[in-house]
């Protein structure tokens, strides 16, 4: 049985989130939490929060322990992009894209 948690519209670019997400895919839950705790990236605490939510969904809704729990799937998709203008010379402007992410974590029990 699987449990899923989704973090929506996280204010970090998906390209940066995917660097951290690739580290925990397929790992045991405890090992994934340790990796996220010691990874010096801005996306690490956010992914850890979504992972904790998926674990809580699994233990609360299905009344199971987390001994054999592992990260089955994890991915980061692009969300909305906020657009801002930066004034430049001669009355022109450059577009600044502030990208956001949807982070999905699926945990399952290893057989």
UniProtKB/Swiss-Prot annotation:
Taxonomic superkingdom: Bacteria
UniProt-listed SUPFAM superfamilies: Ribosomal protein L22 (SSF54843)
InterPro entries to which the protein is assigned, alphabetical: Ribosomal_uL22 (IPR001063), Ribosomal_uL22_bac/chlpt-type (IPR005727), Ribosomal_uL22_bac/org-type (IPR047867), Ribosomal_uL22_CS (IPR018260), Ribosomal_uL22_sf (IPR036394)
Keywords: Ribonucleoprotein, Ribosomal protein, RNA-binding, rRNA-binding
GO cellular component, one term: cytosolic large ribosomal subunit
GO terms of molecular function: rRNA binding; structural constituent of ribosome
PROSITE patterns per record: RIBOSOMAL_L22
Gene3D superfamilies: Ribosomal protein L22/L17
GO BP term, pick one: translation
Keyword Membrane: no
Function: This protein binds specifically to 23S rRNA; its binding is stimulated by other ribosomal proteins, e.g. L4, L17, and L20. It is important during the early stages of 50S assembly. It makes multiple contacts with different domains of the 23S rRNA in the assembled 50S subunit and ribosome.
Quaternary structure, from the entry: Part of the 50S ribosomal subunit.
Family of this protein: Belongs to the universal ribosomal protein uL22 family.
Protein's UniProt name: Large ribosomal subunit protein uL22
Gene that encodes it: rplV
